[in-house]
Amino acid sequence: MAAKSKKPLPSVDQLTKAQAKVEHKRLALEIAMHDERYYQKDAPTVSDAAYDSLRQRLNAVEARFPELVTTDSPSQKVGAQPSRAFAKIRHAVPMLSLGNAFSDEEVAEFVARVRRFLNLGADEPLAVVAEPKIDGLSLSLRYENGELVNAATRGDGFEGEDVTANVRTIKDVPHKLKGKNIPAVCEVRGEVYMLREDFLTLNKKQADSGDTIFANPRNSAAGSLRQKNVAITASRPLKFFAYAWGEMSAMPATTQFEMVKWFEKAGFAVNPRMILCRDVEALLRYYREIETERAQLSYDIDGVVYKVDRLDWQTRLGFVSRSPRWAIAHKFAAEQATTVLEKIDIQVGRTGALTPVARLAAVTVGGVVVQNATLHNEDEIARKDIREGDTVVIQRAGDVIPQVVSVVTDKRPKHAKPYSFPHVCPVCGSHAVREEGEAVRRCTGALICPAQAVERLKHFVSRLAFDIEGLGDKQIHEFYDAKLIMHPVDIFTLAKRDAHATDKLKDREGYGDVSVRNLFAAIDARRRIELNRLIFALGIRHVGEGNAKLLARHYGTIENFRAAMAEAAAAQTEEGNPSEAYADLNAIGGVGDIVADAVVEFFAEERNVKALNELLHEIEVLPAEQVRADSAVAGKTVVFTGSLTKFTREEAKAQAERLGAKVSGSVSKKTDYVVAGEEAGSKLTKARELGVAVLTEDEWLKLIEG
């Protein structure tokens, strides 16, 4: 079940159409994941350079296979969906991102493209504004009659988050515009950022108070702006540079340079390093100057932006997909340094992923002391042939996560041996397996691995699992730290152990007689649990709510399920000759190889089985309810939408599934029924557009009750 090492990615020119389709899907999913982490969670996990390389490969695939381009492709999108934590604001003019240039040649080609598009003669001048590219959070400010009325983040480019109240606390953002010639509607756009000095001071305060430490100034600025508590934003030293605009009822200027100067007169801070250039050579000289002075600047930048100066030419040039033709970002090369890799450590994440980390002889990269760097995964170690004791090149790009770029092989010590990636978890000793098609090796000790314990316990008591009232994330952390709940079974022995303990739970801060009695009662109320909930609670990789129900319905009882998995796990080592139990598992509709392998891997780890057996001594597992094949909705696809009054959404879903229906979260041509409650929205609209049958709650009940 473990996969072989992956080969380096083939050149795009070598891809067949079928391979390109698979590669395009992989790149789109990976880019979407990184967009969400960057734009929504303010917690990027790859460097700017690594992200840019994904974008470049996607663009190359789409250039060779243009039929793969869809409206959902990352090349057609900007940013990520706005967070649900904030109200949304629709941008009157989309907030698009910029195309990137990574070399002098690409900058020269940008200028040549502009000249060709505008049909400029060889001697006709082309003025271009150049300015540092601030590494912060894009923001749009809307003024009506000179007064600030709202502020929104970029979001997905078309719809952003309403952060008006928070933005009003930023000193660089005027509440009322100054001067004359102010348009009735004026949208000013720019970047929220934080000075490096302020970032370091903030992180020290965060550390002293035990709060979250930010990775870099960009993350701290984004996280500070996107606070639900306005007082927190007000306490953070946020700044704002204005450099662009959205909807304008009248234009105060005719050039980019004059517009930015008008922003300054209106009361905004603007970047004093903005200049006007007349040719490619001047652009590149400016780029070198800013690159040289980068470390001395008080704020982070990740490149230089070039914009055609004349606004009428900007209008003629227009846009292509997700970016304007009249502007481009000239990105800096990643900052690098050379040092010795002293040791490779393996860290185990909360999902069981084994991640290699390089421990380095301390080296300064871009003004920051680096002692650790990511090695990504075992394939990267093998591909670069990274060994302990090697002299390596370290790169920091975008101030995110340092990484090992390459090995200086002529400095390799004679005793250095190829690194052997562990096949067991360094924390708990369980098997570490790598699934087909994945780069990550994972610990299979789901129930017993300390590195995964807290997240597994939180999952175990979650709403779709044991759903124990009063035992949430906070309590799980507290009880784990106090060594009161280390494994699932400890939840159900907590009351018994507390009765004989010297330090009673009721004497702990935040607890008392009543709260402890209520907690123990809530735990006892969950000693009887449905089979599908138990299977879901085990936290087996790839086994979500839906697959847990499929497994429960197929095996019926916990005894049948355990016996079948024991047989399948026992025969696991017989390559090419799966047991009858494994074949039966794999044949369940909706399960397949990936889920089947994950379930068998779980039961192949003896300590998981031992932990489950201990748990079963404390609980009663109810047999699965059998699906009715003769009901009126058996085999039908149903969508519930709006506010239901006769039952909860979960009750409606469970009832429909017991009757053999498939419950979906979205409406499509394959949907048979949409059950619409009060205030039904877009799903109801789409159902009517597609001609899908729409039922009220009463009509639904009449249908299923015959």
Swiss-Prot record:
It comes from the Bacteria. InterPro entries: BRCT_dom (IPR001357), BRCT_dom_sf (IPR036420), DisA/LigA_HHH (IPR041663), DNA_ligase (IPR001679), DNA_ligase_AS (IPR018239), DNAligase_adenylation (IPR013839), DNAligase_N (IPR013840), NA-bd_OB-fold (IPR012340). One of its GO terms (molecular function) is metal ion binding. NAD(+) binds at residues 48-52, 97-98, 131, 154, 191, 307, 331. Keywords: DNA damage, DNA repair, DNA replication, Ligase, Magnesium, Manganese, Metal-binding, NAD, Zinc. Residues 628-706 form the BRCT domain. Zn(2+) binds at residues 425, 428, 443, 449. PROSITE patterns: BRCT (PS50172), DNA_LIGASE_N1 (PS01055). The active site is at residue 133. SMART domains: BRCT, LIGANc. Its EC number is 6.5.1.2. GO terms for biological process: DNA repair; DNA replication. Gene3D superfamilies: 5' to 3' exonuclease, C-terminal subdomain, 6.20.10.30, BRCT domain, DNA ligase/mRNA capping enzyme, Helix hairpin bin, Nucleic acid-binding proteins. It catalyses: NAD(+) + (deoxyribonucleotide)n-3'-hydroxyl + 5'-phospho-(deoxyribonucleotide)m = (deoxyribonucleotide)n+m + AMP + beta-nicotinamide D-nucleotide. GO terms for cellular component: cytosol. Its cofactor is Mg(2+); Mn(2+). HAMAP family: DNA_ligase_A. Belongs to the NAD-dependent DNA ligase family. LigA subfamily. DNA ligase that catalyzes the formation of phosphodiester linkages between 5'-phosphoryl and 3'-hydroxyl groups in double-stranded DNA using NAD as a coenzyme and as the energy source for the reaction. It is essential for DNA replication and repair of damaged DNA. This is DNA ligase. It comes from Afipia carboxidovorans (strain ATCC 49405 / DSM 1227 / KCTC 32145 / OM5). The gene is ligA.
